[in-house]
Amino acid sequence: MARRLELSEMKRRIPHQARARDTVETIFEAVARILRREGLDALNTNHIAETAGVSVGTLYGYFPNKQAILVAMARRELEKTEASIRAAITRSASGSEASRAAIRALIRGFGGQNSLRRDLLEAMVVNGHYAELARPAENFARLMLKAAPGQFANLSIGLTEPQAFVLTRALVGVIRAAVFENSNLMGTDALEDELVRLAQSYVRSVASRLKSIGGQNGRDLGRAPV
């Protein structure tokens, strides 16, 4: 198993100033260009620096190696996915629509047939950050309950930690498998339908169980609610 990169290894200099942020953005753009044109095997720090038009020393001032750059780029993509999920749910008129819109945003966040995003997300796994891939799905689960309080009334306190773990890893596991297997299901209504059914059926099952045992709270069934 690959060694997990520690935070101090991921980024050496925090780009607070505009010029520093521009440099980091230039590095990111260079990496994206190389991945699209030449593939992951062609990626190394010398090639990145040359493509970005910066010195290798400047690059190392921000990132210790190419894996750190890939992880930083992947985290930015995950943040965009989370924002897309929040926006999708906010725009939806009903809980059912919210679930579908959020699932669609989650699928798009994992890149579908976008090889660049696949490379970035795989870097998270290789470097020991798999749990972070589930963060957008965790936010989806929380927001879905808020968007449909009547539909999931018994879960007003939220899912317990084990319940949230099972649901989010099920969603992420299916999407990740479809992405890395280059499945023809990616981007189809059929896959979207099944993921929506998975999420809603699981949450309804949990809500029904709570009702059948007299509305016990999440702390009786598991750890703290999510």
Describe the role of every protein-language-model region.
Residues A87-A88, L120-G128:
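Short linear capping/connector segments at secondary-structure termini
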Residues T26, A30, I34-A68, A72:
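Helix-turn-helix
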Residues V56-T58, Y62, Q67, A74, ...:
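Membrane-embedded alpha-helical bundles of multi-pass transporters/translocases
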Residues D22-I34, K80, A105:
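Pre-recognition alpha-helix immediately N-terminal to the DNA-recognition helix
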Residues M1-D22, S92, L155, A207-V226:
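N-terminal intrinsically disordered/low-complexity leader segments
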Residues K11, M73-S99, R118:
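Amphipathic alpha-helical linker/stalk segments
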Residues E79-I85, E97-R104, R108, G112-S115, ...:
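Amphipathic alpha-helical packing segments from all-alpha helical-bundle domains
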Residues R118, E122, G150-L198, V206-G214:
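Hydrophobic/aromatic-rich alpha-helical bundle segments in the mid-to-C-terminal region
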